[in-house]
């Protein structure tokens, strides 16, 4: 499976987020208290950008800024309505100090 570079780990401290694009898909990368997680940057309810939403680092959840749907960053599963479909997640690989994502 191909890997894409995101950034050095030192540039993504706890609570920070970053987006990268791969094949016209925006991917949100978040540092949840040292755990690096990646998911598609789109709410499954209406395609809103999740990167602009409120991040709960302790619970590893993000809230869509449009209608308040919350998503688990580990699984991509919606936790509250109006979203009911999960969003894609991506495996994260640490290569030295570089964060990389497995994409297909």
Language model features by range: what are they?
Residues 2-8:
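Short amphipathic
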Residues 12-15:
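Solvent-exposed, conformationally flexible loop/turn segments
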Residues 17-104:
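Rieske [2Fe-2S] iron-sulfur-binding domain
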Residues 1-2, 87:
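Short coil-to-beta-strand transition motifs
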């Amino acid at each position: 499976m191909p890997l894409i570079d995101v950034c050095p780990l030192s540039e993504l401290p706890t609570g920070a987020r970053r987006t990268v694009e791969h094949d016209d898909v925006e991917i949100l990368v978040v540092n949840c208290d040292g755990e690096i997680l990646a998911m598609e940057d789109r709410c499954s309810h209406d395609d809103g950008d999740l990167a602009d939403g409120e991040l709960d680092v302790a619970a590893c959840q993000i809230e869509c800024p449009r209608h308040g749907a919350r998503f688990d960053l580990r699984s991509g599963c919606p936790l509250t309505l109006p979203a009911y479909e999960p969003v894609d997640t991506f495996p994260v690989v640490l290569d030295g100090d570089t964060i990389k994502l497995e994409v297909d």
